[in-house]
């Protein structure tokens, strides 16, 4: 794993400027927000209308899917219509499998996005094919031959390009040599940029997406390191692919994108949420709001110099996760008077995820609560203590500073845990502390705390700031002080962040695409129905993908996949294998549930 090698004071990574239509991206320009249409690109009226709604939502760049020549020709009319309306928003064509479409559409759009996993090479079909050194070298020559014409055309026309690597759709050749690894993702990107460099074309943006924030963050960090080592300062487009719906999708996006933004990486961003494209923009705005703070901090020392990153990784592995509450990465919730007064013990237990009748805990029940000391000894708290740890405020120091003198304070050293208040430069200060102490013989249990009133802002802020540390294995848990947010929602934010950071698995995980012009069914509606019937299957990963073009690859490490194969038809997958094909849509959901039963993972809700 690549631990953040960037400075304690966040400075944007230097990237050269790339012109995309009428705007520029790069470190000298503001970070741009991007989204993608869900209408069929061939439906010019509908696509133009949706792009207009994106412009109204303050989207900076719009992307459309281009499956073939018909969609490429439609882009000419879409761009003309937008310009006639006075809307000069850059238009991006998304290409998979069809280089001819890329060549055709480059005449009409401002940027072409290609996927190295399927532009020239075959996508990985898990065939077991072996590539000799000669096979591999021949494939690189073929790549240069097939890719160079597009590079030369984009250079001649002044059009930009995105080399968009996706973890779930690496080519068969890359998978055979490097496996499903960060190295494979980076090599895949570098193979293509070398062709661009040789032809003197540098209007290129990179992306290294995955549906797993941990993988995504590591891939971007490694690519940035490798590019900078070569003196190549290409801009980065950040995104967690197929992040999903609602709060889960927001949290997953914030953990991945937010972490990198606080480190100074990223020149454009997109939150790939299942649903209406305009819903992605407020999440992007909130992410930029919460991470821009880190760009304005005073300069401090750099404990994360590249040459020290390996020793930090090794040190972080030595952290002994033993805690007073008997669980790794605990969740604590701060209770206020209004949580305890005017309610019953039974009702409070239910809100905290505990069945008051039999004491059975939901997977998202917190390890404990922190209460005002005056409520100790009350009947409601005594009942609560039978099911979880209860601490009062004075037992748990809250720190707003992180200097060495504080860490030698007897109250801090003797406390069951210490909650570090998340106020910038919180992320950098905690990393600096662990770096200096080398994570050895650490007597203080650090739990990260946050107090906010607004549910939306709390979700983005907590996922960003806590996720950035939890991804690297730092800290022992989180404590949330969100007095105006319902307790079940507080639990959802806390455990969603832990799961997205890859440190606890407490619920069913869904990989669902945001939809595009290739989508073959109502993604939000179908995804919601599947979620409602499977959300009790803790630990299972289910992918709901709109089409067969990207679906089988982008569902990555899902256990089961529900993928649109053609209009009105669904294919079902177990891992990467299609086990049931062309199922009528009206039968497909029940077939999925039957498949779960056949594989022994189904259980009835309790």
Swiss-Prot record:
Spans traversing the lipid bilayer: none
Record has S-adenosyl-L-methionine as a keyword: no
Co-factor binding details: Binds 1 [4Fe-4S] cluster.
One MF annotation (Gene Ontology) recorded for this entry: 4 iron, 4 sulfur cluster binding
UniProt-annotated binding residues for [4Fe-4S] cluster: 513, 516, 547, 554
A Gene Ontology biological process term: isopentenyl diphosphate biosynthetic process, methylerythritol 4-phosphate pathway
Pathway linked to the protein: Isoprenoid biosynthesis; isopentenyl diphosphate biosynthesis via DXP pathway; isopentenyl diphosphate from 1-deoxy-D-xylulose 5-phosphate: step 5/6
SUPFAM superfamilies the record matches: Nitrite and sulphite reductase 4Fe-4S domain-like (SSF56014)
Keywords carried by this UniProt record: 4Fe-4S, Iron, Iron-sulfur, Isoprene biosynthesis, Metal-binding, Oxidoreductase
E.C. code: 1.17.7.3
Reaction(s) catalysed by this chain's protein: (2E)-4-hydroxy-3-methylbut-2-enyl diphosphate + oxidized [flavodoxin] + H2O + 2 H(+) = 2-C-methyl-D-erythritol 2,4-cyclic diphosphate + reduced [flavodoxin]
One matching Pfam family: GcpE
Required cofactor(s): [4Fe-4S] cluster
Family statement: Belongs to the IspG family.
NCBIfam families according to UniProt: ispG_gcpE (TIGR00612), PRK00694.1 (NF001912)
Role description: Converts 2C-methyl-D-erythritol 2,4-cyclodiphosphate (ME-2,4cPP) into 1-hydroxy-2-methyl-2-(E)-butenyl 4-diphosphate.
Protein name per its UniProtKB record: 4-hydroxy-3-methylbut-2-en-1-yl diphosphate synthase (flavodoxin)
